[in-house]
UniProtKB/Swiss-Prot annotation:
Top-level class of the enzyme under EC nomenclature: translocase
This protein's UniProt keywords: Cell inner membrane, Cell membrane, Electron transport, Flavoprotein, FMN, Membrane, Phosphoprotein, Translocase, Transmembrane, Transmembrane helix, Transport
GO CC, any one term: plasma membrane
Primary location group: membrane
Cytoplasm as UniProt keyword: no
Cofactors named for this entry: FMN
Membrane topology: Multi-pass membrane protein
EC id: 7.-.-.-
Subunit organization: The complex is composed of six subunits: RsxA, RsxB, RsxC, RsxD, RsxE and RsxG.
Residues modified to FMN phosphoryl threonine: 187
Transmembrane segments: 20-40, 42-62, 89-109, 123-143, 214-234, 242-262, 267-287, 301-321, 322-342
Biological processes annotated in GO: electron transport chain; transmembrane transport
Protein name as annotated: Ion-translocating oxidoreductase complex subunit D
Length: 352
């Protein structure tokens, strides 16, 4: 009798994978709804574009690799990759950007490594970082939330801007980005970093319309709370574990609090970090990716804490306003090392 020894993972339950991915997609509904409310229909258009391009890219690669297309697409992982990238980019970014990002994410960051379960890096964040480095202007051209916006594009206008760069009336991104103060708006994190470097005091910065929210940036605080609600539902459904989100948020809050106490004139307050940018999206939907995150409980705590520290460092001292994507990828690099030193000890093993 011949016994075959295969490398892990030893089981692969496609039905279970499909169910978890579907739960994550459902949990994203509150966050998507909040982004639609505050930033307009462009988010929905980007999600549709990303979904189609990820499915087509995955199907093409599977066909070339002579693997079952229908069976693999049913695991919903391609849809989730497209969704995460679509909600991470500005809602009126040119159509070709989300297509390029999703195709790169699926073909290079996922299928090139062997497909789902083999990729060491989060595919959606690879796609996002490629776009951010290649097209920094377009990737940082966020619209002001509707509560401080002058021009709010409708569904048809959003489609026209995404595909042609202009609305039917001739408006462009520069016009649509104007806030109630007549100044082009950026995200709370981007505004803070730019203003501090320009020599503005924190007291002055907090008077800007973008910070008119109750807790943090206008619109962004509610978007983050919506992603938090979806994340808590995932925990309740046991689709994700608590270790990574908790250690990530606690570390980010702790670093932000200490930094703010020591340098309140140059560093953002903790609520700005927690309720702006992609904080809650990253904590519950990106870092918890079971393929690219640590697989032990202690490892998950270390992994989340490392990502939280990196996000704060990049936001506070780096060249980019939001460091979630870079933090995720840098933390992904450390996963083999973390798992090696945190794996459970074999029963009966003694220290040498």
């Amino acid at each position: 009798m011949v016994f075959r020894i295969a490398s892990s993972p030893y089981t692969h339950n496609q039905r279970q994978t499909s169910r978890i991915m579907l739960l994550v997609l459902l949990a994203a509904v509150p966050g998507i709804a909040a982004q639609l409310w505050f930033f307009g229909w462009g988010t929905l258009v980007q999600i549709l574009l990303a979904s189609v391009s990820t499915l087509l890219a995955e199907a093409l690669v599977l066909k070339l690799r002579k693997q079952s297309v229908a069976a693999t697409l049913k695991d919903n992982s391609a849809l989730l990759t497209g969704l995460l990238l679509a909600v991470s980019i500005p809602p009126l970014a040119p159509w070709w950007m989300v297509v390029l990002g999703t195709v790169f994410a699926v073909i290079i960051a996922k299928q090139l490594y062997g497909g789902l379960g083999q990729n060491p890096f989060n595919p959606a964040m690879i796609g996002y970082v490629v776009l951010l480095i290649s097209f920094p202007v377009q990737m940082t051209s966020w619209l002001p939330p509707h509560e401080i916006a002058v021009n709010i594009p409708g569904f048809i206008d959003a489609i026209q801007v995404i595909f042609s760069g202009h609305t039917a009336s001739g408006g462009d991104m520069n016009t649509l980005r104007l806030g109630i103060d007549g100044i082009s708006q950026a995200t709370p994190l981007d505004t803070f970093k730019t203003s501090v470097r320009a020599g503005h005091s924190v007291e002055q910065i907090m008077q800007y319309p973008i910070y008119s929210g109750i807790l943090a940036g206008a619109g962004w605080q509610w978007v983050n709370l919506a992603w938090l609600a979806g994340g808590l539902w995932l925990l309740w459904q046991k689709a994700i574990r608590w270790h990574i989100p908790l250690s990530f948020l606690v570390t980010l809050a702790l670093c932000a609090t200490l930094g703010w106490l020591f340098s309140p004139e140059t560093l953002a307050a903790p609520q700005i970090h927690l309720l702006s940018g992609a904080t809650m999206l990253g904590a519950f939907f990106i870092l918890t990716d079971p393929v690219t995150a640590s697989t032990t409980n202690r490892g998950r705590l270390i992994f989340g804490a490392l990502a939280g520290l990196l996000v704060w460092l990049i936001r506070s001292f780096g060249g980019y306003p939001d460091g979630v994507a870079f933090a995720v990828l840098l933390a992904n690099i450390t996963v083999p090392l973390i798992d090696y030193y945190t794996r459970p000890r074999v029963y009966g093993h003694r220290k040498g």
